[in-house]
Amino acid sequence: MARVLVAFGSSEGQTATIAERIGDTLEDAGHDVVVVHAKHPPAELDPGRYDGVIVGASIHMGSHQSYVDSFVDKHNKALNRVPSAFFSVSLTAAHPDPDDREPAQEIVERFLEETGWEPDATLLVAGALKYSEYGLLKRVVMRRVAGKAGGDTDTARDYEYTDWDELEAFVDAFTALLPDAPEQP
C-alpha cells in the first residue's frame, strides 16, 4: 500500500485529534502513515518521498497557523507532485448554512493562493469548544463568540462539532487517489 504523510498545525488540540484519526483510518486501510506536527517536523522530513500527503490546520483570528503556511511554502513543489489534500478546522465550519461557512472557505482559498499549493481535495471541518481547557479570559471570550454565532455557551461542558463520518468519507476519497488504490465501486 501507499506511504502517506499527515502534517498538521493545532492550537487547542482538536486538529491534532483529527489528524491522528486520519492517520488511524489510513493505517486501518493498510497504508504506511507518518503523522507529524508541522511546527516541529523531523529535520529529514521530505514530503516528496511519500505517495500522498494530507495537511491540516485550524483557523484562529482569520488565518491558519503561520508555521503551517511555512511548511506548505517550503514543500509546495512536492505537495503539488503527489496526491494531496488539505483540511481546515474551525467553529465556522460547524454552521449548517453554507453562506455562514463562506468566511472559512475564503480563508482556505487565500491560504492556497498564497502558498501556491493546489491540493486534490479540501475539507472544512467543524472543530470543538473545549471550555474546560480554557483559562478564565479565553472561556469568557469564547462563550461570547459562540453566543453571537448561536453556538453553545454552557461553559461547564465541552462541545465537539466534528463530523467524523464526513471526515472518513474525505479520507476514503483521498485514498482512491493513491497509487495502487483499489477502484471505488
Model-derived features with residue positions:
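N-terminal beta1-alpha1-beta2 submodule of the flavodoxin-like/Rossmannoid cofactor-binding fold
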Residues: 1-82, 172-185
